[in-house]
UniProtKB/Swiss-Prot annotation:
The gene is mnmG. NAD(+) binds at residues 273-287. GO terms for cellular component: cytosol. Homodimer. Heterotetramer of two MnmE and two MnmG subunits. The keyword Nucleotide-binding does not apply. It is found in: Cytoplasm. Transmembrane segments: none annotated. One of its GO terms (molecular function) is flavin adenine dinucleotide binding. It comes from Shewanella sp. (strain W3-18-1). NAD-binding protein involved in the addition of a carboxymethylaminomethyl (cmnm) group at the wobble position (U34) of certain tRNAs, forming tRNA-cmnm(5)s(2)U34. GO terms for biological process: tRNA methylation; tRNA wobble uridine modification. Keywords: Cytoplasm, FAD, Flavoprotein, NAD, tRNA processing. FAD binds at residues 13-18. This is tRNA uridine 5-carboxymethylaminomethyl modification enzyme MnmG. The lineage of its organism: Bacteria, Pseudomonadati, Pseudomonadota, Gammaproteobacteria, Alteromonadales.
Amino acid sequence: MHFHERFDVIVVGGGHAGTEAALAAARMGSKTLLLTHNIDTLGQMSCNPAIGGIGKGHLVKEIDALGGAMAIATDYAGIQFRTLNSSKGPAVRATRAQADRALYRQKIQNILQNQANLRIFQQAVDDLIVENDRVVGVVTQMGLAFESPAIVLTTGTFLSGKIHIGLENYSGGRAGDPPAIALANRLRELPIRVGRLKTGTPPRIDANTIDFSQMAEQKGDSPLPVMSFMGDVSHHPKQISCWITHTNEKTHEIIRGGLDRSPMYSGVIEGIGPRYCPSIEDKIHRFSDKSSHQIFIEPEGLNTTEIYPNGISTSLPFDVQLNLVRSIKGMENAEIVRPGYAIEYDYFDPRDLKNSLETKTINGLFFAGQINGTTGYEEAAAQGLLAGMNASLQVQGKDAWCPRRDEAYLGVLVDDLSTLGTKEPYRMFTSRAEYRLLLREDNADIRLTAKGRELGLVDDIRWAAFSEKLESIELELQRLRAQWVHPNSPLIHALNPHLNTPISREASFEELLRRPEMDYSKLMQIEGFGPGLEDPLAAEQVQIQVKYSGYIQRQQEEINKAVRNENTGLPLHLDYKEVPGLSNEVIAKLNSHKPETIGQASRISGVTPAAISILLVHLKKRGLLRKSA
C-alpha cells in the first residue's frame, strides 16, 4: 500500500536529531515528512533535563546561528541558566541551561507544527526501499510505503535496543517505548559496518522525600544568560535552584557489593559506554582511590516533583539502587519513582559516511545522531540539522555542504566521526578543536549565519537582526580605531585614574581597550569615550575582537596554510593499491576509511606526511586533483 503523496525528504525519528533535520529540510523549501512512532514524544529529553555545557553549548549556538530550534526552545524552557568557565577566556566559556522537560517538548512540538512544508505522521518504520544502490522510500509497521529520494535516519537508541536493570533485561528503545527491531535487521543487511554501544540514566527521585537542607544550593547566574541569538530574558520561565551532594564510602561499599549483579561487570552488556558520562559503578571501579563523587540534584521541571540526580547513572538491580541512593547525604529517606537503567543499541560506523552525513554506499540515505556513535542531545541536533540540510540540497540538485574544522564545532564533530570513527559514544569538548579561539560561542552567528542564509536556513527576521548587529560591531570597531587621545588631551584627566600607567604617547581608543586593566564597559563610562553600544552581545564581540586580535590573526594564518589540503578532494572510488610507494599499512587504512579530502587523509592514524606527498604526486600525474565541494 502506497501513501497518496510523494515527499522530497523523509526524516525517521522525532528526537533532537530528527526534529532539527525535518525543520532544516522544510525551511529550505523541501516537502518534508517526519515519521515518528509517537507524536506525543517529539522533542523528548530522554535523559538529563539540560542543554549546553562545555563544547555542547558551542554546538547549540551553531545550530541557532543556522536557524535551528534547540536554543529557542531552551530559552522558553530553561529554569536555570549558568555560564560555565566564566572566569576563563572566551574560547572555553559555555552556556548551560537546566530545562523543564515538559516546556521543552511543548516548544519543540509547537515549532514543528507551525513549520511550512513539514508534515508529521505517526508510524514506526520497519523497512527501507532501495533500488540500484539508491534509497527511494520507506515502509512502515502497517505496510504503508512512503516514496522519497532522500531519507534521514535519526533512530537514537531504538535500533535493537535492549534495556538492562541488574541481570534482568528486555527489549526497548527507551523506558516505556518499543525498540526498532525490524528496521535494525534491515540496516544490518546494508554494506555498512555495525556495532553496539551502551548508555545509561540514573534513577529519578521524589523531591518530597529529599532533605535539601543537607545539600549545597546552586543558584543560576545573574544577570541571566540567553541561549539563542534571538532570545530574550523575558522568554525564560521561573528560575529555580539546583543542589549539590556527594557519594561517600558507604555508597561505594553498597555499589561494590552489587557488582556481581551488574550487567556491566557480569558480561551481559556487550556495548561500550560513554567515557565522559560513566555509570556510578564504573566510576567507583575506575577511580577506586576517590572517597567521594559529586552529585548534582536537578529538578526536572516546575510542575513535577521528579529529581534527576546527575552523577549516579546506573544499571544495578533496583534494591542496590535504592540502598545507594539512601546512603547519600540528604537522601536518607528518598523514594525512587523511576529506576535507573542501561540501554544497548546498534550504531553504524561513521567512517562509512560522507561529511554530508550521506552513506557512501547507498545514495540518498543519511544518518544523524546516536546511530553515528555520538552521545548527547546537542551532538544529535547538530548532525540532524546538517543531514536534513544536505538531504534538501541533494533533492534540489545542489552540492552538499559541511563546515570545515576551522569554521565550526559541527565541522570538528563530523570530521572526527567520518575520518576517525568511534568505538565509544562520542561527545564534544572544546579540546577537540585545534582552532577554538575562533570557534567561540559568542561568534557562532558571525561564523555561520551568512552561510545559513545562502543555504535557505535563515529566515528574514533572523537575517535582519544579524545584519543590524554586524553593522553596529563594524561601525564601533571603526570608531575605536579612528578616535585618538594624546597626553595633553582634556580627556586624560578622566582616563588616567583607570589606567595602571598613564599614557605617554598618542593612543587610539582601540589601543586603550587592549590594555589588560581596561574593558569595554569601563571605557565607555569614562567621559568623552562613550556612549558605546547598547546591545551587550555586540559590545562583547567588540571587546573580544580587540583584545584577542593578535592571537586571532595568528590562528587565521595557521588556518590559511591548512585550507589547501582541506579543499583538495579525493576520488571516493580510488584504489590506493594503485598508488606506487605507499606502505601496505597506509594502503589498508586509506582503502578502509575512503577519505574525501587530503586533509581527512592526513588525520588518519598511521598516514604519514610522506604518504600524503606520494598521494598528491600520483593524483597530479593522473589529473585526479580536484577541489572538494
